[in-house]
């Protein structure tokens, strides 16, 4: 990933700011993706183990709508795509980006919506939040697919985050693009491209740009705005995003199945990261793709298939385990339509024993 390095200033934006409240509990915005009835018209077995999709930094549920719907259709499972605090349509408040708080927000969301034994799919920032949630709340999580990150500090991400913030704050401080300008999006793209030559990253970040009044900067009544409160994002936030609460999870393990997806051209999952996976997630497996960090953007179909295949296979294996153990009350029954003919026959026989 080639980007232009810029000097970092203490003041992220020159614009005056509206104050943000401090909250330990927020109601997260979300999009519920239900399996398409045209895909599964005769589906009678509903999943009691929903999927919670956690997006990356500067992203939102909007970035992954098609992917989440495909996962829902393929796994016959409801997918809850959430917006983290200070992202997408969720509330702006302090703490801005803190892993312990973000994980608590996910747990609160699951409790609010009565979600139990969830499968977590987390990308980048969402990957670390998902990992922390699995370690601290293992009874809540059934399995996880973790994409493009590891349970360690990742200082290498800081240079990218600084440039991304520079590009977006340039839209606020100096671009002066009118919200009524019919070419506002292309003009915003041109401004950001001066800082970030990678078109796929610019496209990703443009999802934050709106042709409406800013919610956190007074006086921006007729200009385009950035949906996130990035004007409050300073060096401390950059440090928080690259951090990992190692002391908080010392000695903790998640024994459930975990699939790690790694981009071979990305520096996010190092040998140290793989060692940390082995320490905390003894039942993890890894799939690699010849991509950079934006794995979903570069190979959306292949990565989505990996997610779906893992979730389906995991449920099949857990059903077998529960059957062998004689456990009947918490079984997630598997629709044979999800599996190949051999697996479906095995599941059918196992289900008769429940």
From Swiss-Prot:
InterPro entries: AB_hydrolase_1 (IPR000073), AB_hydrolase_fold (IPR029058). Gene3D superfamilies: alpha/beta hydrolase (3.40.50.1820). It comes from the Eukaryota. GO terms for molecular function: hydrolase activity; transferase activity. Keywords: Hydrolase, Transferase. The keyword Magnesium does not apply. Signal peptide: none annotated. Its EC number is 2.3.1.-. Pfam families: Abhydrolase_1. PANTHER family: PROTEIN ABHD11 (PTHR46118:SF4). Probable alcohol acetyltransferase that uses acetyl-CoA to synthesize acetate esters from various alcohols. Not involved in the synthesis of ethyl acetate. This is Probable alcohol acetyltransferase. It comes from Cyberlindnera jadinii (strain ATCC 18201 / CBS 1600 / BCRC 20928 / JCM 3617 / NBRC 0987 / NRRL Y-1542). The lineage of its organism: Eukaryota, Fungi, Dikarya, Ascomycota, Saccharomycotina.
């Amino acid at each position: 990933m080639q980007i232009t390095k810029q000097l970092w200033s203490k003041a992220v934006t020159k614009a005056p700011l509206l104050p943000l409240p401090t909250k330990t509990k927020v109601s997260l915005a979300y999009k519920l993706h239900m399996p398409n009835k045209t895909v599964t018209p005769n589906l009678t077995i509903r999943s009691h183990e929903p999927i919670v999709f956690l997006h990356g930094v500067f992203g939102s549920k909007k970035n992954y709508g098609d992917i989440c719907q495909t996962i829902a259709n393929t796994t016959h499972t409801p997918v809850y795509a959430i917006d983290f605090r200070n992202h997408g349509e969720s509330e702006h408040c302090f703490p801005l980006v803190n892993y312990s708080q973000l994980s608590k927000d996910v747990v609160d969301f699951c409790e609010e919506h009565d979600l139990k034994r969830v499968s977590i799919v987390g990308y980048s920032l969402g990957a670390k939040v998902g990992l922390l949630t699995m370690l601290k709340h293992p009874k809540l999580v059934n399995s996880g697919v973790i994409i493009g990150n590891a349970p360690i500090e990742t200082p290498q991400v800081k240079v990218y985050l600084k440039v991304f913030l520079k590009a977006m704050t340039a839209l606020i401080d100096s671009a002066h693009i009118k919200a009524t300008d019919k070419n506002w999006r292309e003009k915003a793209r041109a401004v950001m491209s001066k800082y970030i030559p990678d078109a796929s990253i610019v496209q990703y970040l443009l999802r934050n740009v709106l042709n409406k009044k800013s919610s956190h900067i007074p006086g921006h009544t007729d200009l385009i705005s950035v949906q996130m409160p990035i004007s409050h994002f300073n060096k401390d936030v950059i440090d928080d995003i690259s951090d990992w609460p190692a002391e908080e999870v010392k000695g903790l393990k998640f024994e459930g199945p975990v699939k790690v997806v790694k981009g071979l051209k990305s520096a996010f999952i190092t040998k140290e990261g793989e060692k940390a996976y082995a320490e905390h997630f003894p039942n993890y497996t890894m799939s690699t793709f010849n991509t950079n960090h934006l794995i979903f953007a570069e190979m959306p179909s292949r990565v989505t298939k990996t997610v779906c295949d893992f979730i389906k296979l995991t449920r099949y294996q857990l059903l077998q385990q529960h059957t062998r153990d004689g456990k009947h009350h918490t079984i997630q029954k598997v629709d044979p339509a999800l599996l190949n003919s051999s697996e479906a026959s095995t599941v059918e026989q196992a289900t008769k024993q429940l």
